[in-house]
């Protein structure tokens, strides 16, 4: 069981969300080009804080603080995608200004930049996905369906240095990228292969050998993906699958190593003309005691929970009534973070599911932090050419906490 303990209002539409790998920190990228980083309270701070002052959250009786660590207008266009480095020290952002910027996660100070190669006509080839594969390798996908590999050890130059490799795994832009865990024989422990979705196909690319394969046409746009291991192994199955979210509300399961075609389908959202798009996927931490489970953020604003093995939806909650969910994940403390529209919500296990008092937390206003990077003024709402499945802006978000329970699992 989860309840929402905090709602963070944003100054513009959310285009990207990233969660720190080892600290309770989240970063957001906005349509205006702003990047903002928040620190969430730890479990210990939540339990012992006596601070009852007003906060930016909608939590009625929350304790503790959500602090704005820094805020800046990082890109002159929109900020399309964000990712933390492997160790969490760096935050990489990419925008429609044709730049990737590497900044210190703690302070927001930019330490390196990458110029994205332009399109054939000389225009900006805007980014769609950025992912730090290892401390040395950054993956960057663009609107033109290119997938660039950069060596992070190369310093910034005003003369655009070419990427170390460029691949084209799909005919359409890369909509999601999921690294595959390193093999047991790996000496570095870092991923060397990854799965991408783009258009109606899935592809697997190797760091050294390039694109290894591309699936058959799935006759449906593939939107999101995630990896889950530790499933029941039987026959040729190793218990490792990549789960892919489609534009019509269907999850498809792909056995690792058998990439030609999907082997299972799960209907998450049904509708007369097809279900809502599954915009983002994440694995629910097993520490929460719910078994193997996937959380899916939908274009309708709902978050649905799918129990693997049962292969069915066991519960759902609502992030927003009008805006779709484009960011979803869990921080190191077990908080679920959902983002979409102009709000980010932070959730935790409800009191009756963990046998303790209800915990909550609030935060400080983000309006007092000065921008620290490329600009110190608020621009008008940035426009973006990305083919995004966006809905009209929501109007009233002043709602109380929502509660979600897992049917037959408590």
Curated annotation (Swiss-Prot):
CC per GO annotation: nucleolus
Listed SUPFAM superfamilies: WD40 repeat-like
Subcellular location: Nucleus, Nucleolus
Family indicated by similarity: Belongs to the WD repeat WDR55 family.
Region Disordered, annotated ranges: 41-65, 354-410
Source organism per UniProt: Emericella nidulans (strain FGSC A4 / ATCC 38163 / CBS 112.46 / NRRL 194 / M139)
Major localization class: nucleus
Name of the protein in question: WD repeat-containing protein jip5
WD repeat boundaries on the chain: 9-48, 74-113, 119-160, 223-264, 273-316, 320-357
The encoding gene: jip5
Keywords carried by this UniProt record: Nucleus, Repeat, WD repeat
Basic and acidic residues: bias regions: 377-386
Taxonomic lineage: Eukaryota, Fungi, Dikarya, Ascomycota, Pezizomycotina
Compositional bias (Acidic residues): 43-53, 364-376
């Amino acid at each position: 069981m989860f309840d929402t303990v905090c709602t963070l209002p944003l100054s513009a539409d959310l285009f990207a969300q990233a969660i720190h790998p080892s600290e309770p920190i989240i970063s957001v990228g906005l349509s205006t080009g702003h990047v903002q980083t928040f620190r969430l309270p730890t479990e210990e701070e939540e339990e012992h804080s006596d601070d009852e002052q007003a906060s930016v959250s909608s939590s009625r009786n929350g304790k503790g603080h959500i602090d704005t660590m820094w805020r800046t207008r990082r890109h002159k266009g929109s900020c399309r995608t964000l990712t933390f480095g492997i160790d969490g020290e760096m935050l990489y952002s990419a925008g429609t200004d044709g730049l990737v910027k590497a900044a210190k996660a703690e302070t927001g100070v930019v330490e390196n930049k990458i110029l994205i190669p332009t399109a054939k006509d000389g225009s900006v080839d805007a980014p769609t996905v950025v992912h730090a594969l290892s401390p040395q390798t950054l993956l960057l996908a663009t609107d033109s369906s290119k997938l660039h590999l950069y060596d992070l050890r190369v310093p910034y130059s005003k003369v655009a240095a070419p990427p170390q490799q460029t691949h084209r795994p799909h005919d359409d832009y890369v909509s999601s990228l999921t690294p595959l865990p390193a093999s047991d024989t790996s000496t570095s422990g870092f991923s060397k292969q990854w799965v991408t979705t783009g258009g109606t196909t899935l592809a697997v690319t190797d760091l050294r050998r390039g694109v290894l394969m591309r699936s058959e046409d799935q006759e449906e746009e593939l939107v999101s993906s995630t990896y889950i291991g530790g499933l029941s192994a039987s026959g040729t199955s190793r218990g490792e699958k990549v789960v892919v979210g489609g534009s019509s509300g269907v999850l498809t399961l792909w056995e690792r190593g058998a990439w030609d075609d999907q082997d299972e389908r799960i209907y998450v959202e049904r509708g007369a003309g097809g279900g809502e798009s599954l915009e983002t996927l994440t694995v629910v931490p097993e520490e929460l005691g719910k078994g193997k489970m996937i959380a899916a953020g939908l274009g309708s604003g709902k978050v649905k929970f799918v129990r693997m093995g049962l292969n069915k939806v066991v519960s759902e909650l609502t992030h927003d009534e009008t805006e779709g969910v484009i960011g979803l994940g869990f921080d190191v403390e077990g908080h679920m973070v959902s983002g979409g529209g102009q709000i980010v919500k932070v959730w935790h296990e409800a009191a009756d599911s963990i046998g303790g008092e209800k915990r909550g937390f609030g935060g400080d206003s983000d309006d007092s932090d000065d921008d620290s990077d490329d600009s110190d003024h608020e621009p008008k709402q940035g426009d973006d050419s990305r083919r995004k499945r966006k809905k009209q802006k929501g109007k009233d978000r002043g709602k109380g906490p929502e509660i979600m329970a897992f049917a037959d699992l408590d």
